[in-house]
Amino acid sequence: MSTPMDIKNALNRVVNQLDLTTEEMSDVMREIMTGQCTEAQIGAFLMGMRMKSETIDEIVGAVSVMRELAGKVELKTLDGVVDIVGTGGDGANIFNVSTASAFVIAAAGCTVAKHGNRAVSGKSGSADLLEAAGVYLNLTPVQVARCIDSVGIGFMFAQSHHTAMKHTAGPRRELGLRTLFNMLGPLTNPAGVRHQIVGVFNQALCRPLAEVLLRLGSKHVLVVHSQDGLDEFSLAAPTFVAELKNGEVTEYWVQPEDLGIKSQSLYGLAVESPAASLELIRDALGRRKTENGQKAAEMIVLNAGAALYAADHATSLKEGVALAHDALHTGLAREKLEELGAFTAVFKQENEA
């Protein structure tokens, strides 16, 4: 039994460009997440890791500890339960595509356990958007599970489930850089989903994160980054995909046209606030009275369709997109959004009583 790695030894390693093993990284992360390190040590470690560049082993070690310390959501089954999530940090300030897509996925009859947070770098995070839509966020894990069982979709507010993250908040904010933690959120779904779309801020992360999820037991995952820099499937450019399926990772590019959708510019899809994002999404999921609403609907269908494929609810990306198109155009997705708001309002009364 080797002695556990501590943060001082880890800093010494990292500053010399030496990698940590999965176990060593887990030791250091446990020290950080249980409040045993100073903010200076945490900041130095995150910066050193970023400059050295995190290995698959190190990310696996970090994710394992975060999953272990998370407030878990226990579901009856994880078969076909999907999450659609991005690292954020793509700098595009586009409306909340993955959150809007989640309601289309649920409308198509697939179960969604959505993990998300407030905006870090963008104008509107998934939590900000849902709050604007009247969804109550401060749920217990049991209440989230009830949402998922009854509505077919539930939202896990990252800060409620990953309370150990509070130790890193100061250093992360003060560094103002993307760090290891930007990658960890999408990999630490509190329900333990094994089907996922993960959007990343850099194409170079696609394959490594697919490999990390393979090591951690995921079944069918698409890790994506578009050529125009988005952490999701783009309407305006090809998207690079690292797909984990049947225990193997394959890489390919996909164009909107391959999936039966016409490419178009992203003009009109950027938002300045959660309220503006919500207005665009309500139009896209509703009557599509504006040109931007129609375009947003296409972008949502593209991403929701990919998630239906990752959930094995469809046998191909193209079939997933066709199913998502039908689910959006029935108006059911808009109803799901209102239904989740109404369902969580009951818990709000209970929790605040």
Swiss-Prot record:
UniProtKB keywords: Amino-acid biosynthesis, Aromatic amino acid biosynthesis, Glycosyltransferase, Magnesium, Metal-binding, Transferase, Tryptophan biosynthesis
Residues holding anthranilate 1: G86, N117
Keyword Metal-binding: yes
Enzyme Commission number: 2.4.2.18
Cofactor requirement: Mg(2+)
Molecular function terms, GO-annotated: anthranilate phosphoribosyltransferase activity; magnesium ion binding
UniProt: 5-phospho-alpha-D-ribose 1-diphosphate binding residues: 86, 89-90, 96-99, 114-122, 126
Matching InterPro entries: Anthranilate_Pribosyl_Tfrase, Glycosyl_Trfase_fam3, Glycosyl_Trfase_fam3_N_dom, Glycosyl_Trfase_fam3_N_dom_sf, Nuc_phospho_transferase
Residues the entry annotates as binding Mg(2+) 2: D231, E232
Subunit field text: Homodimer.
Membership in a protein family: Belongs to the anthranilate phosphoribosyltransferase family.
Its biological purpose: Catalyzes the transfer of the phosphoribosyl group of 5-phosphorylribose-1-pyrophosphate (PRPP) to anthranilate to yield N-(5'-phosphoribosyl)-anthranilate (PRA).
Designated name of the protein: Anthranilate phosphoribosyltransferase
This protein's encoding gene: trpD
